[in-house]
Amino acid sequence: MSFMVTFMVEADPIGKGRPKFVRRGGFITTYTPTKTRDYESIIKDAAKQAMGSSEPVETPVTVAIYITVPIPASYSKKRTEACLSGSERPTKKPDIDNIAKCFLDAMNEIVYMDDTQVLTLHVTKVYGTIGMVEVMVKEDFD
């Protein structure tokens, strides 16, 4: 039986933030930034809804992530048209790898058991009128 799940997060993409360190008493503890934690929660909710009652897969998977970043409001009409036509590409933050990491981590124990199962990863970042991320996960066949 083959496995495939797709879902969409209709929110501006956010890259995974670096862990923060704080001294409490004589100990140093780490925590995930609130912005990252909140965004991962949105991803988890979308993934859970897409999975329904299905259990996480334990086989190797291929993941495709299609990132649409919103065109800045400050761009001129001409520049906006260039963004929508694809002649101007989104080379600014958030970084594509940090967005992917946020999604891969959030899908742990929901879509697959662990992101070490991801053998193939396709990530694309483009401009669009609204920010969103589309994800497809399927079994990886040789």
Functional labels for PLM-detected ranges:
Residues M1-D142:
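Acidic, proline/glycine-enriched N-terminal capping motif
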